[in-house]
Amino acid sequence: AACVLGIMSIIREFHPQVEVHGIIAACENMPGCSAYKPGDILTAKNGKTIEVDNTDAEGRLTLADALCYACELGVDEVIDLATLTGACVVALGTNAAGIMGNDDTLVKNLIATADRNGEKYWELPLWDEYFDSLKSDIADMKNTGSRWGGASTAGVFLQKFVKDVKWAHIDIAGVAFLEKPQQEFIKGATGAGVRTLLNYILEQ
């Protein structure tokens, strides 16, 4: 959300040649008597049902509806980013964000743009087999799978809410906040994604 706010707060100063929508799926995340529980069945904006297997995997649920909404806007490309999975941090550490998507050209262009702007993106797979661990007996899918390949299973989950549009997902869990200085970044929030996405938009 902070990345999207950062981009949208300054992008008009650069007069981009393409139409840009910034979407933030903001909601309150708080325990209480009305909080969702394991075993609940949720219905997403596109009508797909989701069995809540793990309440800690809440970010992908809000992203799912945001992706559905974005695809309804008649856009050419959808790029989402989130501090989505600890599994991405395990895989790539704090040196690179994970990226995956349904269009090779879009993914490769984003990786190249990141490289030119001091960020590192590493492509992770979106193989159909990853969805096997998300299958549910009582809904279209579960919100989490096995502990293995967690970044990719989260990506495959999100892909189910993308329709008829080029899409890329960037998992910035490992690079959004640093516990100690690293390369040109100081300790703390890094603004991960802002430089890459802003420059990608301006290059269109």
Regions found by a protein language model. Give the residues of each.
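A generic structural signal for tightly packed, nonpolar segments enriched in small/aliphatic residues
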Residues: 1-204
